[in-house]
């Protein structure tokens, strides 16, 4: 027989707050959840994401050790 009273209390209508305003309700073991980011204000989901043109770590490594194919072609010429 399962043990009694070992499961946390379930709140099927837990309120989720972002910046002091209620944004949605979900099921949770906490009655209220406070979040910094949610799908309504995240840049990826709102379409305001900015593409930052930065060099990746792999490209930086390859350039540092001269392993990029484009760099080898320039150095051989």
From Swiss-Prot:
Query: Could you tell me which SUPFAM superfamilies the record lists for this protein?
Result: L28p-like
- Provide the GO biological process annotations: translation
**Tree of life domain:** Bacteria
GO MF entries: rRNA binding; structural constituent of ribosome
Kindly name one Pfam family recorded for this protein: Ribosomal_L31
Keyword annotations from UniProtKB, A to Z = Ribonucleoprotein, Ribosomal protein, RNA-binding, rRNA-binding
Q: Which family does it belong to?
A: Belongs to the bacterial ribosomal protein bL31 family. Type A subfamily.
The subunit field of the Swiss-Prot or TrEMBL record says: Part of the 50S ribosomal subunit.
Task: List the NCBIfam families hit by this protein, alphabetically.
Answer: L31, PRK00019.1, PRK00528.1
What protein name does the entry list? Answer: Large ribosomal subunit protein bL31
